[in-house]
Regions:
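Helix-to-loop junction immediately C-terminal to a conserved catalytic motif
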Residues: 64, 68, 329
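Conserved catalytic motifs of ABC-family nucleotide-binding domains
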Residues: 181, 439
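Conserved ABC transporter NBD signature motif
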Residues: 72-84, 337-346, 502
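ABC ATPase NBD coupling module
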Residues: 25-26, 85-102, 128, 249-255, ...
Length: 547
């Protein structure tokens, strides 16, 4: 590393501790960031990558002089232009935040006040810090709206948060951070919750804005393909320690550590599709659906899923993927068309279906923790369907719960834990066990890995594939991740604005010629190669000019 004086941000031997409260044990002190050092020059981007709990966000917040809830910075230096901000005190830190150092969170929706216009919120911190007059701040905001590619930049600031898309809201939050002309911005997973087609626009906008304003940035993510497009250097973190640190090309093309190699190689292999030699377990014929206000959300959708196979339903937010799952499960009645399961028509509404039909079709949700009662133990959560469908109680139910915990590779030691005591991956495994408890034939998987880190998600996918092979399960797997589609699917359905635009075996669905939307979707998936983002944007510009 170079001397700190030549860098805007210099972090040395950073140590951060927190107090842990393990169940049934006295509180204990744990180290969550251990001896981390790095430098960041003006106009450069350092990517921080690792799984949940690696310390990425904790380090990012420390660069703002902030110890997250329950955490304390107990050692090291964080120097901004040679000044150790950890020694400034509360008053000095307040003057920095929102002025020289800014933060862009993962959830832009949670960062904006729904009752105020976007333009007023974008300039608020800049005006409060008296860095510009309100008029100059509005001019700066307009310039940033243009740089970030927001629609109708002259009037964009007059909108409220609910009147713009998720991608537009994320760019508005970036404008808020850039408005005060800060020296440093911390981007904390700004594209994780976005669809691939939206993500590429936001990534391009952030990259362009950083270059235009010569701002330094820490870019936090668990997606190595994404960070490769925007960073100059990458730091790989695990359990609060630095695993590897170097130029992006070296990390991507010649990683030195086993853990980094595992991140680079995650989900490289594609599954060979099965041949349709079985009858369709599920058939959707010309199904349309609408909400109570008459808004049509599905338009004449027809597809089928063969027994023991996986049908991936792919598309961006609002495409109708989850609505299709709601119709299949009976949570939303179709306005026309029919759904048959193992050759028999399914009653449109859930409450009218026989209990055995309910048992045979189960759901696994995207956010496992919101689908579980936080006051129930794993024993209760998995045991509920055992009682509901099979009447199991007492020792018989406990024995079956233990069997299911072994099937999901967690072990019986978790049986009396609560959801809050589980990691994200463990919660999703419990959700899988709960679905298996009903002895289903079809499981609808609604983005079950989208909120998980790549290595954890890979473990969940491998578990699902193993269970499918052992129990001849059929999966309808909803996702917007083409890499997952390639890894697990036998057949693919592409949806766009409530319509089915492509359906067939994976080899056919993911091979040209493509319709325009499928082509866009496939080209928007970040690839683990340098310059991929620039190539995609250049291709888009050429195609746009040709049209």
């Amino acid at each position: 590393m170079h001397e700190a004086q030549s860098h805007l941000l210099s972090v040395r031997n950073l140590k951060i501790e927190a107090t842990s409260y393990p169940p049934g044990e006295p509180p204990k002190r744990i180290t969550i960031v251990d001896d981390v050092s790095f430098d960041l020059a003006k106009g450069k981007v350092l990517g921080l990558i690792g799984e949940s709990g690696a310390g990425k966000s904790t380090i990012g917040l420390a660069a703002l002089g902030y110890g997250r809830g329950g955490a304390e910075i107990t050692g090291g230096e964080v120097k901004l232009d040679g000044t150790d901000i950890l020694q400034l005190g509360k008053s000095g830190i307040r003057k920095l935040r929102g002025a020289r150092v800014c933060y862009v969170a993962q959830s832009a929706a949670a960062a904006f006040n729904p009752a105020h216009k976007l333009g007023d919120q974008v300039i608020e911190a800049t005006v409060k810090h008296r860095l510009m007059s309100k008029e100059d701040a509005r001019e700066r905001a307009l310039y940033l709206f243009q740089v970030l590619g927001l629609p109708n930049p002259e009037t964009f600031g007059d909108r409220f948060p609910h009147q713009v898309s998720g991608g537009q809201l994320q760019r508005a939050m970036t404008a808020m951070a850039l408005c005060s002309k800060p020296d440093l911005i911390v981007f904390d997973e700004p594209t994780t919750a976005l669809d691939v087609t939206t993500q590429i626009d936001v990534l391009a906008a952030i990259k362009h804005a950083i270059e235009e304003t010569d701002t330094a940035a820490l870019y936090i993510t668990h997606d190595l393909a994404v960070v490769a497009q925007i960073s100059d250097d990458i730091m790989v973190l695990r359990h609060g320690k630095m695993v590897e640190y170097g130029p992006v090309q070296q990390i991507i093309e010649a990683p030195r550590q086993d853990y980094t190699r595992a991140l680079v190689n995650v989900r490289q292999a594609a599954r060979e599709e099965a041949v349709d030699q079985t009858e369709a377990v599920l058939r959707v014929d010309h199904v349309s659906a609408q909400y109570s206000n008459g808004f049509k959300v599905l338009h004449d959708v027809s597809l089928h899923l063969c027994k023991g196979q996986t049908l991936a339903v792919v598309g961006e937010s609002g495409s109708g993927k989850s609505t299709l799952a709601r119709v299949i499960t009976g949570l939303l009645a179709p306005s026309s068309g029919a759904i048959t399961f193992e050759g028999r028509p399914l009653t449109p509404l859930l409450k009218s279906r026989p209990r055995d039909d309910l048992r045979r079709i189960q759901l696994i949700y995207q956010m496992a923790d919101t689908a579980m009662n936080p006051r129930q133990t794993v024993r209760d959560i998995i045991g509920r369907p055992l009682t509901f469908y099979d009447g199991l109680r007492g020792s018989a139910k406990t024995a079956r719960v233990k069997e299911l915990l072994d099937q999901i590779e967690m072990g019986t030691g978790f049986i009396d834990r609560y959801p809050a005591e589980l990691s994200g991956g463990q919660k999703q495994r419990v959700a899988i066990a709960r679905a298996l408890a009903a002895r289903p034939e079809l499981i609808l998987c609604d983005e079950p890995t989208s909120a998980l880190d790549p290595l954890v998600a890979e473990g969940i996918l491998k578990l699902l594939m193993k269970l499918q092979e052992e129990q001849q399960l059929s999966y309808l797997f909803i996702t917007h991740d083409i890499a997952i589609v390639k890894a697990i699917a036998d057949s693919v359905a592409v949806m766009h604005r409530g319509k089915l635009v492509r359906f067939g075996p994976k080899s056919q669905a993911l091979s040209p010629p493509f319709d325009d939307y499928t082509d866009l979707l496939l080209k928007s998936v970040p690839e683990m190669q340098l310059g991929w983002l620039e190539k995609v944007l250049t291709t888009r510009r050429m195609e746009s000019a040709g049209n």
